[in-house]
Amino acid sequence: MKAEYGEIKDNYGEIRLFPESIDDLWHLQHLVSPGDLVFATTFRSVEGATDKIRPEKVEKRPVRLGVRVEKVEFSHHGVRLRISGIIEHGMDTGAYHTINVETGYEISVIRRWRPVDLERLDRAVKASVYGVIHILTLEEGEAELFRLRQYGPESVITITAGSGKGGETETRTGFFDTVIKSIAEVSGPMVIAGPGFVKEDFVRYAKNKNCAPAGRAIVAETRRIGRGAVQDVIGAGTLEKLIGDLQLSREVRLMDEVLLRISRDGAIAYGYKDVATAIEYGAVDEVLLADSLLRDRAIVPLIESAERMQAKIIVLSTEFEPGERLAALGGIAALLRYKMG
């Protein structure tokens, strides 16, 4: 994400945003809310004749519009963000319009920027400096490649011994060759993980085949493969050896701490009522919030109160297991400075 800050006074103002990836579009989904004013260049129909019954020509021209947001929808598969609302600035004022935001498309957002919004924006901007991380999970006869999005792992391909055409994966070397083909185009950081010694055998074989991604990969031990192995890798801090601090690593560690404190009846609060009470007493150190609650009208004043108490706000993606666990606890939890009675 690229961002250009305009004039911001008392946390209210304009920021120009340039999404560069699907991760950036996902961030925008949580940065743009109903009530915001969004400016963008879009296309509107312009009639080429004064005859309104049978115009000679109807063409679409680029125009800059300001839309008061009513709805925001993000599509992983369509790789776009739909921002819908009423036109307040530009042609056809009062009409309903949808801005389709794709990568490389500039928008300007005017709103009140909370600290949690600016933290997310800063994270999106910093994330653009390193390549997308891939994690290959591997055991005997089975492999799965994941692309690590900022909202969680995305499965790219699954390979099983004996599943290829012509039996090319029937043998161990044939299976390894198929896996090598699947990672050949990976250009960014990579981790190869799994239980046992198969991953080491694969890396040695792949290096002998001059497979560049395997040559620069970090090898990690996990108890399992698949999505569970990805969480093991993230939770162990392996990715921080590649790129430094990573939000997903922090999410795993924080939720582990939440569950540990719950099991020990420690300094923890979860669920709206208990967290609200803890904030009221100034006992909160960190608040964990599921991203699905960011626009909840009851949650917004609660988060604002926590920020006034100097508590840290960490938003967890519900598309990744730690966020799913948090959602099961009511979508909000707080690590406390001391245990409350």
Curated annotation (Swiss-Prot):
SUPFAM superfamilies named among the record's database cross-references: Dom34/Pelota N-terminal domain-like, L30e-like, Translational machinery components
Protein origin, superkingdom: Archaea
Any one GO MF annotation of this record: metal ion binding
Principal cellular location given in the protein's record: cytoplasm
GO biological process terms on file: nonfunctional rRNA decay; nuclear-transcribed mRNA catabolic process, no-go decay; nuclear-transcribed mRNA catabolic process, non-stop decay; ribosome disassembly; RNA surveillance
Keyword annotations of the record: Cytoplasm, Endonuclease, Hydrolase, Metal-binding, Nuclease
Enzyme class, UniProt record, top EC level: hydrolase
InterPro entries: eFR1_2_sf (IPR042226), eRF1_1_Pelota (IPR005140), eRF1_3 (IPR005142), Pelota/DOM34_N (IPR038069), Pelota_arc (IPR023521), Ribosomal_eL30-like_sf (IPR029064), Transl-rel_pelota (IPR004405)
Subunit architecture: Monomer.
Family, as annotated: Belongs to the eukaryotic release factor 1 family. Pelota subfamily.
General function of this protein: May function in recognizing stalled ribosomes, interact with stem-loop structures in stalled mRNA molecules, and effect endonucleolytic cleavage of the mRNA. May play a role in the release non-functional ribosomes and degradation of damaged mRNAs. Has endoribonuclease activity.
Protein's name according to its UniProt entry: Protein pelota homolog
Organism per entry: Methanoregula boonei (strain DSM 21154 / JCM 14090 / 6A8)
